[in-house]
Amino acid sequence: MIALPVEKAPRKSLWQRHRAFISGIVALIIIGTFFLTSGLHPAPPHEAKRPHHGKGPMHSPKCEKIEPLSPSFKHSVDTILHDPAFRNSSIEKLSNAVRIPTVVQDKNPNPADDPDFYKHFYELHDYFEKTFPNIHKHLKLEKVNELGLLYTWEGSDPDLKPLLLMAHQDVVPVNNETLSSWKFPPFSGHYDPETDFVWGRGSNDCKNLLIAEFEAIEQLLIDGFKPNRTIVMSLGFDEEASGTLGAASLASFLHERYGDDGIYSIIDEGEGIMEVDKDVFVATPINAEKGYVDFEVSILGHGGHSSVPPDHTTIGIASELITEFEANPFDYEFEFDNPIYGLLTCAAEHSKSLSKDVKKTILGAPFCPRRKDKLVEYISNQSHLRSLIRTTQAVDIINGGVKANALPETTRFLINHRINLHSSVAEVFERNIEYAKKIAEKYGYGLSKNGDDYIIPETELGHIDITLLRELEPAPLSPSSGPVWDILAGTIQDVFENGVLQNNEEFYVTTGLFSGNTDTKYYWNLSKNIYRFVGSIIDIDLLKTLHSVNEHVDVPGHLSAIAFVYEYIVNVNEYA
């Protein structure tokens, strides 16, 4: 999720990008077509091109029912979900946190250099200390890069790898031009009993998860729980600006302490539970993220008076290269270890709305190339879904020329890619060079990469350069089977089947995929088991407000998120 400058048009957040396919999922099921956003099982060995952590089921796709995993220490789960006094107290805690405007921009100073810029973060820290006294009495608090909060609840067995919970303290700005459109002031934290919503910026991204983790641990302390496994909370402060000051520093600090694969599992913000058909629910903790890369493409030519122009200015060359890129999108590459396949499987096996033909195509795809091709065709025809099975490209910025009668010496544009699971930064770079070479040869330009590595020598007209600006490989796939997954999935199953939904057995757990990136991108070397999940039932209309006007969160969803964190901590200690 990327921060937005105040007064500028809102930029689509990671959650906003996902609200589209979540909305589309429900509609697509109703009309009997295809839907996806998340998935389950890895591919058969002969089809998997990329290793994943752990061994997943490699046979017939099945959206099997997970056995609920209920701990013996379950003192307050029912209280969290159903007690009016706890509910009212929780509403107040979340509302008060939303009232503190911990806003970040795209670019932010180092906290030590400009503490006044972060004054509201210090206010939030004081609020935590006053609101959660047991945590601040019994847990060790360390501050990393001034504002990163690291809470450690020491377990009795130092040989056990710690459990790590993540969230971020920061929120995106509010566009001042939208203030009149807000139902309640954006930092009011207003609770509306008619809708059962808490309103305000950050209420659903992600002060809900932040406060849920605090509340769960505070309640465990009140209940007298004593962990044998250490519990760590790592709370960044600039996730909306890519986490370069917060999560990056925290991850480095934790790596020095615990080393490679030193953490049992990591839970951060992510997707939740969706009702994919009437009374059929699927939980989708995210176990993978696409990669990311930005390239700056420069057409470096010569200036002069516009009255004696060449056949093609640098702007013209840039335009044709952009056209070449956009006329040649990346191929669709779908394998069955793509997490989106699991939700398709759940729909095929449990939805009453999908046609038999659709179900046969989904379930038969691993065994029949023709059906796999048909499945890919269906996915690729859904505009909100196709980005999950290919590398995307978007030309987002372009600059060239300064005056009507002066030829532009240089034209530059930026192209952003979200990299498919089985691709890489190098593969994307090579492909971009291929098309740039075609244009360079066509118009007699040289070609270089990263400024000084010439593929074609510079000519009298100039040269084209492609420079890599920022890169992130696709995230490793975390397990969708095995002991760590079983405890996570079993906890989700128990909290929702037996608690939130009151014995509704049409509840399934699978995994999911993000096309954007969370703070977990800095934590890959700390654990093979990274899951992005908030224990709440997804409301489509609610998701439309993320990073936008009238952001809000439903109270029942917030309470279930607390219950999940509470029970997951206990289950990890009892069963891992």
Swiss-Prot record:
* Residues engaged in binding Zn(2+) 1: 205, 240, 547
InterPro entries cross-referenced by the UniProt entry? ArgE/DapE_CS, Bact_exopeptidase_dim_dom, Pept_M20_carboxypep, Pept_M20A, Peptidase_M20, Peptidase_M20_dimer
| Cytoplasmic face residues | 1-19
Which Gene Ontology BP annotations are present?
A: proteolysis involved in protein catabolic process
| Annotated transmembrane regions | 20-40
Reactions that this protein is recorded to catalyse: Release of a C-terminal amino acid from a peptide in which glycine is the penultimate amino acid, e.g. Z-Gly-|-Leu
The protein's required cofactor(s) are namely: Zn(2+)
In what way does this protein cross or attach to the membrane?
Single-pass membrane protein
Q: How is it modified after translation?
A: Glycosylated. Ubiquitinated. Ubiquitination mediates sorting into internal vesicles in late endosomes. TUL1 is required for ubiquitination.
Question: What PROSITE patterns does this protein map onto?
Answer: ARGE_DAPE_CPG2_1, ARGE_DAPE_CPG2_2
Residues recorded as binding Zn(2+) 2, renumbered to this chain, are 168, 205, 268
Stretches assigned to the Lumenal side: 41-576
| Placement of covalent cross-link Glycyl lysine isopeptide (Lys-Gly) (interchain with G-Cter in ubiquitin) | 8
Q: What is its EC number?
A: 3.4.17.4
Where does the protein end up?
A: Vacuole membrane
Q: Which GO terms describe its molecular function?
A: carboxypeptidase activity; metal ion binding; metallocarboxypeptidase activity
How the cofactor is bound: the record states:
Binds 2 Zn(2+) ions per subunit.
Q: Which UniProt keywords apply?
A: Carboxypeptidase, Glycoprotein, Hydrolase, Isopeptide bond, Membrane, Metal-binding, Protease, Transmembrane, Transmembrane helix, Ubl conjugation, Vacuole, Zinc
Q: What does this protein do?
A: Necessary for use of certain peptides as sole nitrogen source. May also cleave intracellularly generated peptides to recycle amino acids for protein synthesis.
UniProt free text on domains: The transmembrane domain contains polar residues that mediate the recognition by TUL1.
Protein name as annotated: Carboxypeptidase S
